[in-house]
Amino acid sequence: MLDVSPRAPSPVDEVPHTLDEPVPRTLGLLDQLGLWGNLGVSLLGFTGAVAVLHPGGPDAPPLSLLAALLATVVGTALGSAAIAATAALGARTGAPSMVLLRGLFGVRGSAVPTVLNVVQMLGWGTFEIVTIGSALTQVVPGVPRWTWVVAVGTVTTLLALRPLGWVRVLRRYVSVLVVLALGYLLLAVPAPASSAGGWSGFSTAVDTALAVAVSWVPMAADYARHSRSTRAAALGAFVGYGVLQVSCYAVGLVAAASGDVFAVFLAVPLGVVAFLVLVGRELDQSFANVYSTTVSVQNLRPHWDRRVLSTVVGVVTTGLALFVHMDDYAGFLLLIGSVFVPLTGVLLTDRVCLRGAGWDLSPTAAARPLMLLPWALGIAAYHLVPAWASASLVSFLVAAAATAAVHVLPQTRPTQEVSR
């Protein structure tokens, strides 16, 4: 039987080994800006820019560069606001994201989104390792892809064992290099010769950019709970993630309009150096997914040691990355949006309707099965809206309105007002 009990007390400046230990509050505004800024820049973001530019698929007419950039700004701004709002809740309560859902659904009910989030995070972690491995194969073509995948998976797992320590490294060193590399590519990548394309598919492009941002909502509180203040958590998430994702997509859109994204980067002078900086930075995305998968599992098993869980998750994502390819990435993004956009609407609306009353985040939190109804309605709305409408916005509004309606019914409030 797997022994997941802690062997020694957690260090006071690092994430506790279990959910039963005190939560250190060591991250300031610069730490949060560094973390979320780095999460906003991704090799997958460059791939996502292709999906924004071609919302109808590679064989459909593309958006114009202006339309694609505007879709990126709108989707990113909405998604960053959702991240910031969830981060504020995490900083205020000291609870990770899936534990917050105990207040929304009760302990048993929170298992449903927790399992879905574990699946999502395993998917993201796998895609990140695949992306890094594929990128390194282009830079050093003589090394087999599987070698890079195993190496990246190993480093990812090691970083996930000391997440707060790695956040401090991001803030002090990596963020500066990333900004310089991104700025250089933005100036060096040649602009496309023409502005072909239109506005057809604009709402789908918004949903694609929004889905990438919203995919981070289920992990926002995992780091925000370590913030010294609510302001640092919310502002760091909104500004750091929003500005850097838009910048990342802008570079990707220009490159995608000119040809293969990675090939365009490598063709410019010093492009290999800038590209390698971004490849190395990608490790923060992969380790963040491994860590948040671990914390999500701890919502179901609070006493399990996160070090053991992170090791297991790292091995699983690395194993999957040996066989997974990027063909279904765009579909994966839209599926994520259909689940987590309405969940965010339910979460934030429920908090507002409670008028500041505390959620019951304890291991005995009572079930609130009615709150699953607005979430289900939001998911249905996402898949039923016509193609010209924004599925993300409609599903969020439907879920939020249904949550507000549920609050006029009896027994929708948590039976206790305590925070973990």
Question: Model-flagged regions — what are they?
Answer:
Residues 1-65, 201-206, 218, 225-235, ...:
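Membrane-interface "cap" regions at the ends of multi-pass membrane proteins
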Residues 51-88, 102, 109-111, 241-242:
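Extracellular loop-to-transmembrane helix junctions
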Residues 88, 131-139, 153-174, 192-195, ...:
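Membrane-water interface regions at transmembrane-helix termini and the short interhelical loops
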Residues 147-188, 197, 234-241, 333-345, ...:
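Membrane-interface loop-to-helix entry segments
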